[in-house]
Amino acid sequence: MTRTIGAVLGVLLLAGCAAGVGEPKPGAPAHHRRGGFANVDASHPHASGWTRWTFFLSRVLAAIFAPRSVTLPAVENDGAALRANREFPTVTWVGHSTLLVQLDGVNVLTDPQWSPRASPVSFAGPRRLNEPGLAFEALPPIHVVVISQDHYDHLDVDTVKRLAATHHPRFLVPLGIKEWLAALGITDVEELDWWDARDVRGLTLTCVPAQHFSGRTFWDRNRRLWSGWTVAGRTKRLFFAGDTAYYGAFREMGQRLGPFDLAAIPIGAYLPPEIMKAGHTTPEEALQVMLDVRGARMLAIHWGTFDLAEEPLAEPPERLERERQRLGLEPDRVWVLKHGETRQW
């Protein structure tokens, strides 16, 4: 126990006290900095290093001495229908921000995470509260993987190595992550800046802005870019927000790349606001993101899988439903899937 506490506190101390990046780079886009990247909207400043440190310390102690759990309904999904599907656009919620998206015969994974923990160590850190909704072995052939950022709940070493070894997909990542993947032996990678696009197997995938931050160690805070993604096929468009706070750029995304048939938007990890508001949306803000990007429907992600914040674990969809009713939106416009559930979109 002492070893576990010491290791985790050391990791979190490094993360909480991490240094930022340098000044703007002359002639470069506004989010580029010397040595890394920055948000262009300063309306949600990040908490101080000390505030972050004390929060994460409290989370570590709570996880050790008072771990929380929640049992959420799941759908048994053996993947057979997904492996046979070549025609219908579908989306399957594996858990957290991991989606299997099928569009025009192409299989896309977002932020794949199949590990028991979202952590740099196997014996501590946020543990998975519910099993992945689709077993890794049940996946159809994966053609494309998109990564939104380098945090442990979105970029998992074991999962991406396993995908590269068994499925050989094309990885599309924000700036700075290609080199990190190359160190793992993963080389079929293209890294993109905000608003860059690539055509893969007939789909157009665009890297879009997000309001967040990055870093896996003491030394690399904001050294790699963070983003969302859009996926456009012959007749359907999907928006994947990644991990983000609410800010005004979503309206521009909707104008430039929308409308979207489905918008996958995070609804969890929003309390306490002094820590979380700079990088995460509340359920209420998530619905505003859907409206801003001109989404026909919203799919709730980033909740019910890892215990990352202080809100009750089952609260995010409850708040989402109350806000949907307040806005007068039709129930079918807001999807809260069970782990493993597949829907056509």
Which residues are covered by each model-predicted region?
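Positively charged n-region of N-terminal signal peptides that target proteins for export
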Residues: 1-4
